[in-house]
Amino acid sequence: MEDQIEQAVDIAIQGVGDPAVRQQALDFCNQVKASDEGWQMCLAMFAGDRKRSDAARYFSLQVIDEALGRLNREQLVYVRDHLFAYVRMGSGLSQGQANVNVGQAVSFADDPVHMKNKLGETLAYLFIMTYTEIWDTFFYDFERLLESPENQFGNPRAADLYLRVLNDIHREIGDTLIIRDPAVQSRNNDLKDLIRNRDMARLADSWKKILMYYKDQQLEPLATEIVNNALRVIGGWVSWAELTLIAEPEALEAIFNLLSSPKSRIHACDCLSEIVAKKMYPNAKFQLIQSLNLTSIIHTLSQSADIEFDERVAKLANSIGSELIHIVETESQEFSANCEALLLDMFPLLLRYLGNEYDDTSSQVLPSVGSYLQLVRRDSKREKAKINPNRLTKNTADQYENFPADRTFISDQRHAVVRSILEAVMKKCRYLDDQEWEEDEDGEFCELRQRLKNLQDMCASIDNQLFLDDVCPVISQALSLPPTADWRDIELGMFELQTLSEAMRSGALSTVKTGQNESPATQAFNNLFFQMVASDAVAQCPQPAVHLLFMEIVVKHSSLFSQHNTNLLNRVLEFFVSPLGIQNSESTKVQMRSWILFHKFCKSVKPQIGQVAQLLVDSIRPLLVIQTEDDTDSDDESAGSAFNAQLNLFELSGILVSILDEASATNGVEQTLQPIFTAVEKAIGVSPPNAESITLVHHNLVAIGTFAHGLDGSSNKLPDGILQLFKNSAEVVNVALDRIPDTKVREAARTVFTRLVPILGSSILSEISTLIQILLQRCSHAELADFLGFLGHLLHSFRNDEGVYNMLKSLLSPLCQRVFASLEELSASADAGNTDDKVLKVEIQRAYLMFIMQILRDRMGGAIVEDKQLADSIIKSVIHYASDPTDIYTCRSAASCLTKMIQLWGNGELEAASAEESVFDQGQKIDGFEQIVLEFSGLCWQVPASSGFNLQDAQSKILVTELGNIQKHIYLKKGDQFLSYLVEQYFPQIGVPDNAAKDYVEKLKTLENKDFKKYFSAFVNELVK
């Protein structure tokens, strides 16, 4: 059987071969894992006479691992005896038990690392299952294996395995980074307590002695691995072991000496980091750091040629710094002063690492630097809170304008450190001389910069003036550089200007005015902003990163432009339309982003653009040609992003055209739309339509709508010539829609008409009617919800237009038939298990109810009740959804529809919601509705009482208040007739006590709607208990 298992495992892991055979092998392996005897076969295979393949042995241990949790005591003892006998023989000793037979194992040193680790992992799992009651001599038995004639720990095979097992035990029960179930965590805590009581002293002694012995065994092949694993064990177990058992002078000296060993110094450094991070009282932690003399040791290790080691030393320095800062935060002033003095000695080292050219090393010290700034800021705020506000003066914005300077609340030492941090951070924010710009905002350096910017913000919030004094000169000097200067210096200045801007927006820098004067930060920024606009270094720098920052900053602060600085405004506009902006051919990212930013900028400064609008329109026009070739060369997401960015230019073109005089505007619209018409005509001529032609039609139609949206903001009435061109657009859309029956084209058509309606109004009712007929015939189930939303939007836009009302009357019956048919098909599919159709069904139900509600709100309910058969179908459907709380949102929407119907039709004829309003066909009789209004009351009680209804759920509570709304509106329409119905007929049926019934009808009569809904909720809660 063992041979079959080995063969199956070897076949299963092969990357080649017959897939069917591999699947059979996998199935066989899974059967072995699941079987009750599988672990025994695998134990025999692993520890048997014959050396199996590594894959088979690894699989055997996996099967044993999974089985351990379900084995009884006798079986666990069996596994222990055989595995430990195997370990003894692998360590070069006899198997130790006459009744246990295992094969002649080879040295563990011959195994690959992954096999050693797997054996250690399995023994750790076995420890967890047996240490409490079965194998309490676990550690003692392993330590006996370590002995050799030369030394108590001189068996390298056993020492290597022993340390791997200890590392795995810590990982399973002591590693706090792993989130575990409460039951598992409780078991782990119990195991740790047992270890502390039984074995911890001996364990700690063994680690130290192993470390001391093997660090000098230069000729032993396993020596380095054993030393490094011993350091890992000490670093891991120290978090939950008694520190005095580990931090003995002899052991610490050995660890310190290993800092100079190229093969072990990284592990030694990590070990010290864990020792420093051990939780203990602040006083004890301070004494530990002092006794270890770590600050001096760190200084001797700094700036190594070994990059990875340098990073670990930085991590250690960060650990020490963070611990010292925590002590300063929590201890008394006298004690924390001594601690802060030690911390200040470390800061030159922390800042040196902060400025390291390797970002991974630099990142290591950011937490401690950030913690120090938080400490200073907290203490500064505490001191500021002591200021008596009665002695201060407030400005018109209710802000204190003569508050003492930030510098007043910071000691000289701390002020100097904050300044040195700020300077180091700014230097680190600069791209290195051999580093290129990262276009990806998620790039490593960009992420690091964001963290550094957060540190700058903290510096700013600590001392505004310090920040301005240090940052502003860097910005000004960069903006004053010649265009031929290193782009990295210019880019740094721009980055810092953006940081200054964001610090003002976030409140890190105060913008409080003093009298009529702007704040120092505002004044400084405004000066630097206009220096940037006028800077040749920025305008002529060839680096796209600089161009992008420039455009981002001017868009955020476009409000600084006015009629008094149009020359600077024109300079910015010129920049945007140059090859550095929207015409950029060097960077696709910058070009697409510039299209978005140019749109935002012009929209903001539209009143100041004036005469240059025509030049801007002409500059944009070449970029309005829609291409689809790139869609096949890149993924759909990037192609879609390019088109979405281009749409900004279409809307911007509309905005700019609206500024022009009538003749120029008409000409501008024609020059924009005519190429689109031509492109659509060409695309719909492709037979049969292909993916490219469909995409081209879609994009061009959406472009029409987006361009129209830009013109929609015009305060003046558009010329007749422009209106006719857009009317032509509506006709083009319908032609394209008729010729290409595709989802994307239908979606684009809805978009275009949504944008044309505000411009053309009722003049395109004929085209809208044609559009709706085509969409109704062709839209799929998936489009139906969007189609209903589109119709609802149209109704609202033309809510006062009788022509649209008449169109709705002719449309509503076939539309509802289509909705009901789709829902019936989807229900059948959903019942058969199609989850997608189940979701789609719910979406259509909700869209349908929203559409009905829109009809009622827009006073067009006459379209529903004109046809009694249609009215009955709609009312029944609404009652059905309102009676089914399995989907709370749908149920609530239906309940709202019923409330509206009762409000408008409750007296048996079409009425307005108030005396100030009117409805179409007001006064029209509604046969039968008045008689069924009282019956609506029943669902108000049936829904909360239905099975599974949770009255404590937030959405359910909202639904119940809507049901109360129905009750109130029935009463408002039916008065005493409804009260009599409740008291004499309905309440007796459902068992409401007489006194409760009387109280209910009294509250229904007297309470306002808002108060009654609260009462109704409480009443229902009591009723369904």
From Swiss-Prot:
It comes from the Eukaryota. GO terms for biological process: tRNA processing; tRNA re-export from nucleus. tRNA nucleus export receptor which facilitates tRNA translocation across the nuclear pore complex. Involved in pre-tRNA splicing, probably by affecting the interaction of pre-tRNA with splicing endonuclease. The lineage of its organism: Eukaryota, Fungi, Dikarya, Ascomycota, Saccharomycotina. This is Exportin-T. Pfam families: Exportin-T (PF19282), Xpo1 (PF08389). GO terms for cellular component: cytoplasm; nuclear matrix; nuclear pore. It is found in: Nucleus; Cytoplasm. GO terms for molecular function: small GTPase binding; tRNA binding. Belongs to the exportin family. Keywords: Cytoplasm, Nucleus, RNA-binding, Transport, tRNA processing, tRNA-binding. Transmembrane segments: none annotated. InterPro entries: ARM-like (IPR011989), ARM-type_fold (IPR016024), Exportin-1/Importin-b-like (IPR013598), Exportin-T_C (IPR045546), XPOT (IPR040017).
